[in-house]
């Protein structure tokens, strides 16, 4: 529907998806676009660094672009982005080259809008179940750290040169969210 707004010289009349680095992420963007009948071309640039450079350049020039990344990611802490949403997540074990890229009969974009991935705080279950660690366990159960906050902290560390500790302290000083985590 909006392909003309995302078309470039290299994609002609098709819209452009800045595709994921195929070798590292194994996402098969063009196959997914074709299965869904989306008239876009996946332009795969080889690395995450190249993907981000292309996206940042488009953003800086105020050119429309389409890409996807996980969250939290520093790109979202650095740039104001708009999510477009994807079809509901559905597992699709047959979306493989060996199975000729079948779409499981779903008619949807396999393995997209991935199921929510919750950051887990790794700990020894036996240790955390012991009575002397009850407060620590209560803390981790209450902890909810927004992706947007994490993305901004990633920018402060990666671009602005803060240490992780400094970025955390800055966040703590400007937010009261963490106080609700305390037992």
Regions found by a protein language model. Give the residues of each.
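Glycine-rich anion/phosphate-binding loop at the beta-strand->alpha-helix junction
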Residues: 22
């Amino acid at each position: 529907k909006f392909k003309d707004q995302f078309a470039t010289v290299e994609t002609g009349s098709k819209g452009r998806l800045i595709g994921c680095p195929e070798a590292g992420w194994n996402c098969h963007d063009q196959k997914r676009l074709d299965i869904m009948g989306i008239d876009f071309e996946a332009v795969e640039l080889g690395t995450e660094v190249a993907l981000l450079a292309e996206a940042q350049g488009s953003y800086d020039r105020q050119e429309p672009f389409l890409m996807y990344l996980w969250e939290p990611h520093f790109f979202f802490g650095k740039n104001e982005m708009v999510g477009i949403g994807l079809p509901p997540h559905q597992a699709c074990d047959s979306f493989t080259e060996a199975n000729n890229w079948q779409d499981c009969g779903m008619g949807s974009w396999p393995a997209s809008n991935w199921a929510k991935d919750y950051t887990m705080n790794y700990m020894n279950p036996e240790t955390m179940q012991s009575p002397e660690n009850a407060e620590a366990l209560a803390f981790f159960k209450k902890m909810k750290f927004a992706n947007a906050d994490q993305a901004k902290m990633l920018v402060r560390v990666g671009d602005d040169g803060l240490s992780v500790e400094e970025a955390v302290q800055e966040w703590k000083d400007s937010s009261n969210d963490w106080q609700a985590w305390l037992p």
